[in-house]
Amino acid sequence: MFTGSLVALVTPMHIDGSIDWQALEALINWHIASQTQAIVVAGTTGEAATLTLDEHKAIMRFCVDIANDRIPIIAGAGANATARAIELTLAAYHCGCAASLQVTPYYNRPPQRGLYAHFAKIAAAAPLPMILYNVPTRTACDIALETVTALAKITHIIGIKEATPHARLAQIRQLFPKNQSFKIYGGEDALCAQAACEGLIDGVISVTANVAPEAMQNMMHCALNGDLKQAQAINQRLAALHESLFCETNPIAVKWALQRMGKIAAGIRLPLMPLDERWHESLTAALVAAGITIQTH
């Protein structure tokens, strides 16, 4: 299945907030050339919360068409309404996505039995591989280890993305030893090199890969193949970038960085805002430290 560096892709937008399809196509081709292992579209970093249902489905179709079997497209298809998540997952299946990423239902804070029923019903609706997504800092909802264990027995549920501390990754790995079919993906760029070196994750679903795709893939390849020294060296070069990309709520900073690189326009949808000027200098310095070419104003 999917290992290494998977990018949590931004949704490029024009200044008026409309989707920039030309820029999206260019980003997909750039990630293919950079050997990114899969692209997650219309997820948190892709501003799924402010996409219309039609836009969400159109992004899935467009990315699958542009990828043309050159790279797997994973659809962000999660929702806090089970019926909507099923609708998005069916759309992802029918347009040819390789898998779906399913965030825990946010805001309504279901009990563990509700989480199990939610994901089980989605898995039953479409024969599409599913990756669970646990990000309690955003959702106010945490999947218990017992619930993960139960869900992993369902045929189409193939892994989990954990945007959680190192200790939780270690607990998940104890449940699912390496080389099993159930995969573990890190969701915190700053932790992924160490976690991969320790064998705790099989890949990362990365924000940093938006701006440094080749470096992230090289780092993960080294970490997963025992070249720990080189993995740590690459991670050290990216350390300031990992931090700076979260100086404000994701994807504010990463979209600004991509704009400075000349990859996308400055569009972002309310209630998110363009990056506050007080962060411009530090993020620019982090990009330069990572060896990334930026455009001068």
Curated annotation (Swiss-Prot):
It is found in: Cytoplasm. It catalyses: L-aspartate 4-semialdehyde + pyruvate = (2S,4S)-4-hydroxy-2,3,4,5-tetrahydrodipicolinate + H2O + H(+). It is an enzyme of class 4 (lyase). The keyword Isomerase does not apply. Its EC number is 4.3.3.7. GO terms for cellular component: cytosol. Pfam families: DHDPS. GO terms for molecular function: 4-hydroxy-tetrahydrodipicolinate synthase activity. Pathway: Amino-acid biosynthesis; L-lysine biosynthesis via DAP pathway; (S)-tetrahydrodipicolinate from L-aspartate: step 3/4. Coiled coil: none annotated. Gene3D superfamilies: Aldolase class I. Pyruvate binds at T45, I205. One of its GO terms (biological process) is diaminopimelate biosynthetic process. The keyword Transport does not apply. It comes from the Bacteria. SMART domains: DHDPS. The active site is at Y133, K161. Keywords: Amino-acid biosynthesis, Cytoplasm, Diaminopimelate biosynthesis, Lyase, Lysine biosynthesis, Schiff base. InterPro entries: Aldolase_TIM, DapA, DapA-like, Schiff_base-form_aldolases_AS, Schiff_base-form_aldolases_CS. Homotetramer; dimer of dimers. This is 4-hydroxy-tetrahydrodipicolinate synthase. The gene is dapA.
